[in-house]
Design a protein with these regions (language model features):
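Structural motif
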Residues: 25-27, 54
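Short beta-strand segments within Ig-like beta-sandwich modules, predominantly Fibronectin type-III
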Residues: 28-34
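Short, exposed coil/turn segments at beta-strand boundaries within extracellular/luminal domains
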Residues: 56-61
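Surface-exposed, glycine-biased beta-strand/turn segments
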Residues: 64-176
Length: 176
């Protein structure tokens, strides 16, 4: 097992094993490509000690990994439209429908290693929201932020941060 990356809460790990093996992390089977490459996304509040199970053709092996704790900031944003903080029932239905499409696209496995070409910034701008930060919107505590926001003028061209294959296009979504 080879494992590299950011061993911190919210980090990303890049692994390699025999392509015939099965990899499990947090009791979930991890997709492995034909070359044995895989990615582990560590959760915002990932346990500080974790196990990776490698199941080979003849034996199983457990690998212990240590994860460092990450400190998150609190982000207060006021002046947002009320429906963006507390959507009504019709908007909640829309959000649920859009979220389902996004979730399905995120779980689509492509037997490719686009990430190996590296990453660049998709747009120049000010970072206005970071992964993991706790959000207080119009004075109301909301779930942590699970993305990276970059402010740019409306109509600014945004490029892919890495080599990629588009698996979902959605226009005029509720939040994005």
């Amino acid at each position: 097992l080879e494992l590299n990356g950011s061993f911190t809460q919210g980090g990303l790990l890049f692994g390699k094993t025999n392509s015939k093996n099965k990899v499990f992390f947090n009791n979930k089977k991890i997709f492995i490509n034909d070359s044995g490459d895989f990615i582990l996304a560590l959760g915002r509040d990932e346990k500080l000690e974790n196990l990776i199970l490698i199941e080979g053709l003849k034996k199983k092996k457990t690998h212990k990994i240590k994860i460092s704790k990450r400190k998150y900031k609190i982000q207060r944003i006021d002046g947002l439209p009320k429906n963006k903080v507390t959507p009504d029932q019709e908007e909640l239905k829309r959000i649920k429908k859009e979220s389902k499409k996004i979730s399905i696209s995120k779980n689509k496995f492509l037997n490719k290693t686009f990430y190996k070409s590296g990453f660049i910034w998709p747009v120049k701008g000010i970072v206005t929201g970071k992964y993991g930060n706790q959000r207080i919107l119009n004075g109301q505590h909301r779930r942590p932020h699970y993305g990276l926001d970059i402010a740019a003028a409306s109509g600014t061209k945004v490029i892919s941060p890495s080599d990629a294959e588009v698996v979902l296009i959605m226009e005029d979504t509720f939040f994005n």
